[in-house]
């Protein structure tokens, strides 16, 4: 059975993944699967820079607005949904194109991946849950430095799960998850967009400015009024900072600056993940030849056996 070809476009936030994916999909008769852990949630539009129906240009998109913010959408769920979508898109004679910046989600589709769901130790988890974020992250850094580089200390839920897996298996979380063996069902081409760090950070700051102009504060306030502060989806950048403002613990300008700062740090972590975890064909973003270079790589890839 021949492997299904899949184009995968990755890179940091604000680098230009969406526009490139649309152009490739137009020319290659493709359908796009969002590889973004936040864009699956309805009501989180401005803060996630979610593509609009106009921007889709008639290209069919998948895994956008599929669940309410109160219902968690896990990496395991993304893995199963995406694998089914790849089969469906391919069976209709279309080219599957995955685009996004959530490395864990995208990687789970193409590599032998174990989420460590076989067992739990509720008592151990409760003990971890009673500890503060900094203490937990330092524990992870000591036990599994590789995972600590890729999981932010503010992501308490993910840090706890990593420590729990280490406790249950006796192995580092990073080793338990990925064995770096490609799934033999697919033939992926990983395209990564990169940009000069100063230019990328400038784009990120400008994007946040535009989000505020588009009504991010109102969008976040609606979610805040629905008492969703403790929902995992709301812990994403752009919402948690504004919730702090709504609670009177910061000014609006401080919240905005923190969103920009956290977004820049997130972009740096995204690049670290993709460079360390996946074999990517890197392309310089923001140039007149970006699309042409990407298209040439895709054509060569599709022509190969």
From Swiss-Prot:
It is an enzyme of class 2 (transferase). ATP binds at residues 11-18. Residues 36-39 are annotated as: Interaction with substrate tRNA. It catalyses: adenosine(37) in tRNA + dimethylallyl diphosphate = N(6)-dimethylallyladenosine(37) in tRNA + diphosphate. The record marks 102, 125 as: Interaction with substrate tRNA. Belongs to the IPP transferase family. This is tRNA dimethylallyltransferase. The gene is miaA.
């Amino acid at each position: 059975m021949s492997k299904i070809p899949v184009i995968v476009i990755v890179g940091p936030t604000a680098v230009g993944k969406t526009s490139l994916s649309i152009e490739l999909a137009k020319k290659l008769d493709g359908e796009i699967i969002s590889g973004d852990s936040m864009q699956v949630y309805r009501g989180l539009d401005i803060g996630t820079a979610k593509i609009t129906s106009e921007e889709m240009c008639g290209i069919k998109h998948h895994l956008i607005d599929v669940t309410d913010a109160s219902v968690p959408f896990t990496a395991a769920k993304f893995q199963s949904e995406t694998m089914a979508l790849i089969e469906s898109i391919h069976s209709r004679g279309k080219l599957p194109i995955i685009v996004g910046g959530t490395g864990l989600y995208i990687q789970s589709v193409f590599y032998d991946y174990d989420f460590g769901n076989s067992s739990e130790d509720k008592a151990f988890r409760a003990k971890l849950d009673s500890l503060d974020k900094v203490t937990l992250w330092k524990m992870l850094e000591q036990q599994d430095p590789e995972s600590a580089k890729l999981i932010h200390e503010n992501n308490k839920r993910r840090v706890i799960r990593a420590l729990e897996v280490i406790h249950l298996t006796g192995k580092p979380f990073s080793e338990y998850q990925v064995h770096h063996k490609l799934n033999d069902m697919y033939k992926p081409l990983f395209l990564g967009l990169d940009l000069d760090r100063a230019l990328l950070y400038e784009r990120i700051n400008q994007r946040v400015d535009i989000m505020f102009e588009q009504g991010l504060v109102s969008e976040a306030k609606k979610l805040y009024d629905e008492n969703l502060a403790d929902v995992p989806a709301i812990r994403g950048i752009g919402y948690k900072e504004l919730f702090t403002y709504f609670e009177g613990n910061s000014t609006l300008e401080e919240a905005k600056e923190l969103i920009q700062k956290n977004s820049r740090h997130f972009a740096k972590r995204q690049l670290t993940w993709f460079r360390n975890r996946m074999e990517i064909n890197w392309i310089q973003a923001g140039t007149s030849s970006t699309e042409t270079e990407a298209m040439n790589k895709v054509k060569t890839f599709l022509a190969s056996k």
